[in-house]
C-alpha cells in the first residue's frame, strides 16, 4: 500500500514539473513581452528565482528605455540575491544604484551590493579581497546615506569585517615568527600595531616583538648578537611602558633576563680577547 502511494506521489510530482517546464518554455519562446513580464514576476513571487532570472535576462533587452526597466532590473538583482549568488547580486545591485540613482530602491540596492560582498567574505585564513571590497563599499554607502536607518547595521558589518582582516594580519605576522623569518616577523608585528590601533592583539604583538628580537639574537652570528639583544631590551621597555600589568609580564621578564645574560657573555668574551692582546 505504502509502495503504491509512493509511486503515485512521484508520478504527480513528475506531471507537475513537466507542466511547469512546458509553461515556462511556451512563455519563453512564444510569449509577448508583457506576458513574459507578468510571468517573471509570478516566478519571483513563488520563489522560482531560476526561471525568473531567465525571463529577466530577456526583459532587460525588451524593455530597455521604458518605465518598466527599473522594476525589472531591481527584481533581477534580487533574484540573484535570493539564489545566494552573491557575486552577481552585488554587481547588479551596484549597477542598479548607479543607473537609477533617483529610484526608491537605489539606497537599498547600494546597501545590498555591499552586504552581498560581506556574505561572500570567506573565513579569515583565506584570501580577503572580497572582505576589503565589502568594507570599502559599506563605507561608501554610509558616506552617501549618512541618515539611513541602515547605517548602524552597516557600521556593525564594517567592525566585523575589520576584525577579520586584523586577525588575518596578526596570524600572518605570527607565522613569520613560527617559521623563523625573524626580521619579517619583527617588521610585521610592529606594522600591525601601527596599522590597527584598535587591534585586540596589540599587547601580544608587543610581547612577540621582544621574543622575536631575543630569538633572532640567539641565532645570529656573533657580530650581530649585541645589537639584537639590545633590540630585545628596547622592545621590553616599550612593552612595560604600555602594559605594566600585562598578561605577558612574567615571560617578558624572563626574556629580559636572558637578553642580559647574552650581553654579559658577549662582554666577557670581549674582555678575554682584550687581555689576550
Question: Where do the model's predicted regions map?
Answer:
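Bacterial N-terminal signal peptides
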Residues: 9-17
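Acidic, polar-rich low-complexity tracts and alpha-helical solenoid repeat scaffolds
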Residues: 2-5, 17-277
Amino acid at each position: 500500500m505504502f509502495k503504491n502511494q509512493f509511486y503515485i506521489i512521484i508520478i504527480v510530482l513528475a506531471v507537475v514539473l513537466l507542466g511547469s517546464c512546458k509553461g515556462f518554455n511556451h512563455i519563453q519562446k512564444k510569449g509577448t513581452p508583457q506576458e513574459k513580464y507578468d510571468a517573471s514576476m509570478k516566478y519571483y513571487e513563488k520563489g522560482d528565482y531560476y526561471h525568473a532570472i531567465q525571463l529577466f535576462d530577456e526583459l532587460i533587452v525588451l524593455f530597455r528605455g521604458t518605465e518598466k526597466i527599473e522594476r525589472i532590473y531591481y527584481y533581477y538583482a534580487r533574484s540573484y540575491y535570493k539564489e545566494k549568488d552573491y557575486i552577481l547580486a552585488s554587481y547588479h545591485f551596484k549597477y542598479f544604484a548607479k543607473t537609477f540613482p533617483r529610484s526608491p530602491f537605489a539606497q537599498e540596492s547600494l546597501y545590498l551590493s555591499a552586504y552581498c560582498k560581506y556574505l561572500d567574505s570567506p573565513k579569515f585564513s583565506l584570501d580577503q579581497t572580497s572582505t576589503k571590497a565589502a568594507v570599502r563599499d559599506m563605507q561608501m554607502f554610509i558616506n552617501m546615506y549618512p541618515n539611513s536607518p541602515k547605517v548602524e547595521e552597516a557600521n556593525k558589518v564594517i567592525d566585523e569585517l575589520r576584525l577579520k582582516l586584523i586577525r588575518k594580519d596578526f596570524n600572518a605576522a605570527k607565522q613569520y615568527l613560527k617559521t623563523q623569518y625573524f626580521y619579517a616577523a619583527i617588521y610585521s608585528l610592529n606594522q600591525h600595531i601601527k596599522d590597527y590601533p584598535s587591534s585586540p592583539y596589540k599587547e601580544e604583538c608587543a610581547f612577540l616583538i621582544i621574543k622575536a628580537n631575543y630569538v633572532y639574537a640567539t641565532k645570529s652570528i656573533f657580530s650581530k648578537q649585541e645589537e639584537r639583544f639590545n633590540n630585545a631590551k628596547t622592545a621590553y621597555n616599550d612593552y612595560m611602558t604600555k602594559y605594566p600589568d600585562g598578561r605577558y609580564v612574567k615571560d617578558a621578564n624572563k626574556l629580559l633576563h636572558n637578553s642580559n645574560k647574552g650581553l654579559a657573555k658577549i662582554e666577557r668574551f670581549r674582555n678575554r680577547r682584550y687581555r689576550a692582546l
